[in-house]
Amino acid sequence: GILPLRKMLDAGVPIGLGVDGSASNDAAHLLNEARQAMLLARVGKALEAPRIENGRTVFGCDLGPSDMTPRDALRLATRGGAQVLGRAHELGQIKEGYCADIAMFRTDTLSMAGGAVHDPVGALLLCASDNADYTIVNGRVVVREGKMTTVDMGPMIERHNQLALQLALDAA
């Protein structure tokens, strides 16, 4: 089934999104997870039976986009994640005294063309989001111009692939 996300949020249920790597999200891309949550919430609404309102037939597919907007989904990935971790007092938003955890994305790319002109925040979920150009974690730059600054990714990726292959072989 599809989680009744809007109903749960309206009832005050704390909900957050996150990624922890290949075990649960092969891309380890939080924007992809936020987009998926948004689309599933919209599909869930679209599956509702038509109803009559003010003498007019209303279909769920007409209401889906308003049920979960890109900003709603981004809130789940930021403030929502901080809330469910019990850290809303220090994470989840750009605010004085909070951890400086920030990801920055270019909006002048082909994948963002058109969408970012009208709504750059929404375009992060509605367009094909690239990897972050800059990422700051607790005030420290860890990605600069799309490249990790804290580790050499080549050996890490090679080791990761070796372990994934070994795991698959062991499971066979």
Language-model regions: role of each:
Residues 5-109, 126:
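His/Asp/Glu-enriched, well-ordered alpha-helical/loop segment
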